[in-house]
Amino acid sequence: KVATTIDTNIVPLDSVTSPREAIPAKALNKTVSATGHYIANFRAPNQIDGAGKVSDWEVALMQIGTNSAILVVRGLWSERLLNPDIQQSMNIDVTGLLVASQFGDRAENAPGVISRLDSAVVTSLTDLDLYDGYILATSESTRDQKLERSRVTPEKLQSKIPGFYWQHLSY
């Protein structure tokens, strides 16, 4: 297992990355904040959390300002109805971990379902400038209330590079 260092200082999303650009390496795993409103909701099936548990996650596309957006993992799909009073017109403050896009599909794309956590799979649904990667939300709040729900933890990444041993080098 590979240890991932997480920077817990909260920085504004637009101070570490920009829409339509690859996430700079120094921005990965930073704790970021963003304010916007959710304009679309998706189910992301077969996601694996930090404990190795497979479940479906709720992912929203958050519009930030007038012309950009980022995917936000809000929590478990099974808890998506916990905040029925959230409307698309409401501004939401999100804090969470900035994570690189997934590159392998976990499911098929279908209406309301995304195959992986990657803004590339929603480009046909919006003309907004999309940020690379996604925010794994640790907290969400509106002007007057904190949105309480279970939060998911980042998947532990496995190194795919095979090891070399001295006996292999001596032949």
What spans do the regions from the language model cover?
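Surface-exposed, charge/polar-rich loops and edge strands
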Residues: 1-171
